[in-house]
């Protein structure tokens, strides 16, 4: 019997802005329009330089959804020298490529044309489905309408973009709702074959949010959801948990196959109170399994060419580099 392989990526986290049109009850990432709400180009470049020196292969670009809808945001965006957040994101993705790091953008709801525009500079993209249920946590958050998120996932499939999605567990959904969400992901993947992985992320309450006192799902509940996902989803879709948010060592046996992006350079800006595990601790987390670094584009998508031809030299070079290296970080 072959040993199990647990994968991870080495990344830098680049939150281009914390301004967002949504008002999710569990989120502390979103901030008002204020000084420092936009990451400036020189700040992005400094992080990319550190990431290059640390051997990072992924630049995770995130920003609040449709920040231009928030009054006063454009005045701060102008300081970057770009007219729209999409212009800025595209330019910073190109900058990441010049540093030899593959971009992965997760920016909330994007249209078909917006994703098509970003595709040449992104090895993969993502959007958390979170849930197909309508829940109080998403009141005032039009970007969290399930139909809108599912439609974007379909558009990504039509564009042949390797895609990451997932569920946020413990925000008011039920076990039946989780099953419905997993089935929806499975059905979209059956049509397009583009889902690389799903993240099963446990809710972590944040101070000074409406859901600060919500119950946190326990490890057994997360394990049951992982088992459900493994039963519903095709084997080629990896199941990821975040090792800074939960004791991943207790979930490896439930069917987890990936630990996601872990950074030697940047914090988890969405969950800043939860530091990444040290790279030397990852082997302890996976136990008897084999730990293997990967790129943000999974190997099975490299061979068929699910990316812009302009990315091929860098993808091949980075893939060869991590393939030659040890499974140790």
From Swiss-Prot:
Binds 1 [4Fe-4S] cluster. The cluster is coordinated with 3 cysteines and an exchangeable S-adenosyl-L-methionine. Its cofactor is [4Fe-4S] cluster. Residues 6-244 form the Radical SAM core domain. [4Fe-4S] cluster binds at residues 20, 24, 27. InterPro entries: Aldolase_TIM, CofG_family, Elp3/MiaA/NifB-like_rSAM, F420, rSAM. SUPFAM superfamilies: Radical SAM enzymes. It is an enzyme of class 4 (lyase). Pathway: Cofactor biosynthesis; coenzyme F0 biosynthesis. Catalyzes the radical-mediated synthesis of 7,8-didemethyl-8-hydroxy-5-deazariboflavin from 5-amino-5-(4-hydroxybenzyl)-6-(D-ribitylimino)-5,6-dihydrouracil. Consists of two subunits, CofG and CofH. This is 7,8-didemethyl-8-hydroxy-5-deazariboflavin synthase. It comes from Methanoregula boonei (strain DSM 21154 / JCM 14090 / 6A8). The gene is cofG.
